[in-house]
């Protein structure tokens, strides 16, 4: 997904401002999902905020792209993924692009 520089900065700022503690560590389970604790954390955050940042563990058995795809699929088409670097990505509401 192409995101303008302005929107990218806004999404990153939203996720950073809302972090309040540690970034959840994404623990992949197989190729299709993540620990319930990580998803529950994200659901709780998304009830209040519009962006949640995730960080891949170095030992994760799946690729960064596959992990981001799984997270996005878990939340549906109203959300998109913004890749920050090779370990971090942000799940955000598509409405932030408008």
Range-by-range predicted roles:
Residues 1-98:
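Positively charged, polar, low-complexity stretches
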């Amino acid at each position: 997904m192409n995101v303008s520089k302005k929107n990218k900065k806004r999404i990153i700022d939203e996720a950073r401002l809302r972090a309040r503690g540690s970034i959840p560590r994404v623990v992949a389970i197989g190729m299709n999902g993540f620990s319930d604790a990580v998803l529950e954390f994200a659901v709780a955050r998304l009830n209040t905020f519009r962006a949640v940042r995730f960080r891949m563990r170095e030992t994760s058995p799946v690729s960064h792209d596959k992990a981001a795809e799984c997270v996005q699929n878990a939340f549906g088409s109203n959300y998109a993924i913004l890749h920050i670097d090779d370990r971090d990505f942000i799940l955000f509401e598509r409405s932030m692009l408008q």
